[in-house]
């Protein structure tokens, strides 16, 4: 497994590649951040299930991807990294972006943990805009 500085971008790329190849599941390195993002993706219905395998530095999250219909169209149409190590993006609760008019979600890292833009707006808190999922 290659060592990467941006685990979130790595996770999003792995999910994007797996959905385009119509894979049943995808393994991503387990970190506190990727666990939280996997939890949000599961709560929002973008992945059907996720579990952790292995332990310590070799721990991996296995996400079961969702498809719809006979043509097995992916539920996840796009993933976009917003804030990155070279250019952080922060928003207060009034500036939080709406993804595709509310169809997609923005995943925000707040002082209350990682949550969707909808939850952050409801709680009246802003934070770092990690990525868009639609």
UniProtKB/Swiss-Prot annotation:
Is Transcription regulation included in the keywords of this UniProt record?
no
Gene Ontology molecular function: rRNA binding; structural constituent of ribosome
Biological process (GO) annotations held by this record are:
translation
Record GO cellular component, one term? ribonucleoprotein complex
Task: Kindly state which keywords UniProt assigns to this record, in alphabetical order.
Answer: Ribonucleoprotein, Ribosomal protein, RNA-binding, rRNA-binding
Superkingdom field:
Bacteria
**Would the keyword rRNA-binding be found if you checked this record's keyword annotation?**
yes
Alphabetical list of InterPro entries matching this protein: Ribosomal_uS8 (IPR000630), Ribosomal_uS8_CS (IPR047863), Ribosomal_uS8_sf (IPR035987)
Please name the Pfam families in this protein's record. Ribosomal_S8
Which Gene3D superfamilies does this UniProt record tie to the protein? 3.30.1370.30, 3.30.1490.10
> What SUPFAM superfamilies does this protein map onto?
Ribosomal protein S8 (SSF56047)
The family line of this record is: Belongs to the universal ribosomal protein uS8 family.
Output the HAMAP family linked to this UniProt entry. Answer: Ribosomal_uS8_B (MF_01302_B)
What function does the entry list?
One of the primary rRNA binding proteins, it binds directly to 16S rRNA central domain where it helps coordinate assembly of the platform of the 30S subunit.
Q: Can you state the subunit structure given in the record?
A: Part of the 30S ribosomal subunit. Contacts proteins S5 and S12.
Q: What is this protein called?
A: Small ribosomal subunit protein uS8
Source organism = Synechococcus sp. (strain JA-3-3Ab)
Q: Which gene encodes it?
A: rpsH
